[in-house]
């Protein structure tokens, strides 16, 4: 998230208690129907933090029923003034500000995030997103249409209905609010499934949603696993829309489930293998730092990671040298500890996948400049890794790594690099570094990406639409476009005795 004035960062909380570990339905806390629970871990220490109720199909059914009841015509939620919906969202933002330290500590412990990043960037982004969505609540409106004949025609922007929202583990709280903010602003009700790795901040949000004054059933939170709770949401006949952020593989399953059930609307924000192109005329210091942050931020666990770095031939060697020098500055360790600049990967599965891809880079002939292996005796830590002499056919140049691995490729001409940059199934984002405005406009127009950054990278804001081309998904989140995903347009035509201009 882009930010202006940054607050001071306090010390994280110690002896944090996890008060909310149950399923949240109708503004009440429930045990799972099955009686099952699942463990939640700290990826930096591999220690169990707590156990959370494991939602399944029966729990999703209960949540959807509550959401449907809250969405009925004449309900407190449906009859509420749009401006009052905005007031509730602003109240929720106030409560997040009050609990900012607690939530940031929880994100760092459960998600392996650097505490300072969680406090400044994640929580800062959460608050700004909610306030932006609150402002839109009474500005979502229809139009009158000058239809031929003696008719009066207007459109209504109505809420879609019950929205299933499936949240990823890399930005658990921020993505929770990217989902519920626009949905609630438009007047929908929601059933949210947080990622099984990182459910704790979402469950704390349940308590704040109730405290803010949202009517029962408007927001329901069902922690659980993707193949059970997630699949139940995607295939549910009484869910009108599902929004998902996560892998392309799972996105395909969700779209298939939607098609096989009630053809519910689907918006997807999926994987990426984003190109970042550095031309010889770029400000080299700026390009090195942005490209570095673009791939190493949050241990590389970002869908927009600048994971295909194309550098023009004449500056290639110097760029590699500076990039390696920058990567070697990291201090790995517990993300709650001051001075640490890289935390762990989220879990063992991701850790092993990243190490396997690093090994493939070595075997396929890329030059390992630094890193290249695990770090420490406890936790899922991987050394910051830089490869040079990478070719487009290598696995590390084609597959989404989702780890602290930078691969730097060489290019000679503008036409060549555009072709190579677009030679991927993905199309989420891209970066261009140049001081030539004509080149910047030409390349940004040619790239098949939902977002293109010029002389910067990973600059995301609630005011700007975000989403992908190709297999990086469909639909947009945030910005004015993001609200279209959560409304249906109804045309109303009334016969009148005489129309006048």
Swiss-Prot record:
PTM-bearing positions, type Phosphoserine: 413
Q: Which GO terms describe its cellular component?
A: axon; cytosol; synapse
Which InterPro entries did the record assign? Ald_DH/histidinol_DH, Ald_DH_C, Ald_DH_CS_CYS, Ald_DH_CS_GLU, Ald_DH_N, Aldehyde_DH_dom
Q: In which pathway does it act?
A: Cofactor metabolism; retinol metabolism
Q: What class of enzyme is it?
A: oxidoreductase
The UniProt record gives the binding positions of NAD(+) as: 167-170, 193-196, 226-227, 246-247, 269-271, 349-353, 400-402
Q: Which UniProt keywords apply?
A: Acetylation, Cell projection, Cytoplasm, Lipid metabolism, NAD, Oxidoreductase, Phosphoprotein
PANTHER family in alphabetical order: ALDEHYDE DEHYDROGENASE-RELATED
Q: What is this protein called?
A: Aldehyde dehydrogenase 1A1
Gene name as annotated: ALDH1A1
